[in-house]
Amino acid sequence: MNVPFSYASPTLSVEALKHSIAYKLMFIIGKDPAIANKHEWLNATLFAVRDRMVERWLRSNRAQLSQEVRQVYYLSMEFLIGRTLSNALLSLGIYEDVNSALEEMGLNLEELIDEENDPGLGNGGLGRLAACFLDSLAALGLPGRGYGIRYDYGMFKQNIVDGRQKESPDYWLEYGNPWEFERHNTRYKVRFGGRIQQEGKQARWVETEEILAEAYDQIIPGFDTDATNTLRLWSAQAS
């Protein structure tokens, strides 16, 4: 459905970035700048940077659909993408601009980068390889998508207490994930277990355990290019 509309693209000037970060903090996160903590400022910055990637992402998707190009689909149980703020800033070429904007607001970019949780989506070479493939596809301008699982927890947090290792759950989504877009209308039933019931020449899969798989999309930017791709992760929901 083509509906005519107009909008103003977010600009990359230091002043515009300052306004955008403050706006996200107040109207998206709902926090008073006077009492916001570092993680809330981090999320506001992530939302502001994401805004500046969305337009090229949608443009890439539109071009791929209109040209009916072939795409590479990379399926992996893990995507060890790591912290994404610094990568996004370098890909967009706005690292210094965001650094200056935050400095003028009394904040430190490096400190905010350190606040970002490492996504618990992988823990080894398999996940790192998958993430590198997605980065390379975007940097080379090759249409592609990654498909994986949106784990709620990473491996575990490790602390040393009285000389012994103590493990605790690593809930990496504790502060949310501003990079992702939840796709409420893209859900599928996934069934486990059960048994096969034979009815003449037909067979039915019955007495199964069902969950819903819901899609979450994340932008994968290419370095120094308008090309972007998508990482789609599936989250398990109660049916």
Residue ranges of each PLM-predicted region?
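A conserved ligand/cofactor-binding region detector
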Residues: M1-S239
